[in-house]
């Protein structure tokens, strides 16, 4: 099976065999790419991986970028002769998940992550933190009701915003920084973004725990979740592939596997 997770910053492809993700590939989200370009990229990588007896029989897509969804559907139908499954809010009902929010429309990536979390950690009150372009804190009851949320900028937006709104500050990369105080401009900005993001997430989690006043099983996913590998004092599980795992679980429910 081919899993396609289309985000605002990156597109993540997952190659899945027997319900196991054996390889993930990531490229930047560029709305002008064509189905032909995506096929060339995928075909080249899959051939290089030399996976024995791998044939794409199913494709499932999560997308928050409609302009990229269209060429991905074309890729699926034209090159693989497959009608892909496109995740939408109706799939919450199939997975016995209730969206108990005033705004019922969830991003498909959020829904997939929540499907993954409630499947992996059943009968628990959950706080699922999706750390992508935006950082979304999802509160889910042990009865599978999504009842609360907090949404903040992601680390990438924080760094990008500083660069866009200043004339002289340099562009930085998103990496772990061991200490907060530096004597060079570049490392001072890197440290500010990294430690500022860590402090923001920790502070919001602390406030959520105070307001909820109950045990929450905390799970982090998304590209920025790896920044918290050394900060697991309050995050129980860090799983960058949680969204894709949720897509696998949904696929299995839809096709009774």
UniProtKB/Swiss-Prot annotation:
Which reaction is the catalytic activity of this chain?
(R)-pantothenate + ATP = (R)-4'-phosphopantothenate + ADP + H(+)
Question: Which pathway?
Answer: Cofactor biosynthesis; coenzyme A biosynthesis; CoA from (R)-pantothenate: step 1/5
Names of the cofactor(s): NH4(+); K(+)
Q: What positions does UniProt annotate as the active site of this protein? A: 109 (proton acceptor)
* Compartment(s) where it occurs, according to its Swiss-Prot or TrEMBL record: Cytoplasm
Q: Which residues bind ATP?
A: 5-12, 133
The UniProt keywords, alphabetically, are:
ATP-binding, Coenzyme A biosynthesis, Cytoplasm, Kinase, Nucleotide-binding, Potassium, Transferase
Q: Which GO terms describe its biological process?
A: coenzyme A biosynthetic process
Stored InterPro entries: ATPase_NBD, Type_III_PanK
The keyword Cytoplasm appears for this protein: yes
Q: Which residues bind substrate per the record? A: 107-110
GO MF annotations, alphabetized: ATP binding; pantothenate kinase activity
What does the entry's cofactor note say about binding and number?
A monovalent cation. Ammonium or potassium.
Entry's EC annotation? 2.7.1.33
Cellular component terms, GO, for this chain's entry? cytoplasm
**Matches recorded under NCBIfam families:** baf, PRK13318.1-6
Q: What the protein does?
A: Catalyzes the phosphorylation of pantothenate (Pan), the first step in CoA biosynthesis.
Q: How does it assemble?
A: Homodimer.
Sequence similarity: Belongs to the type III pantothenate kinase family.
Protein known as: Type III pantothenate kinase
Q: Which organism is the protein's source?
A: Ehrlichia ruminantium (strain Welgevonden)
- The gene name on file is coaX
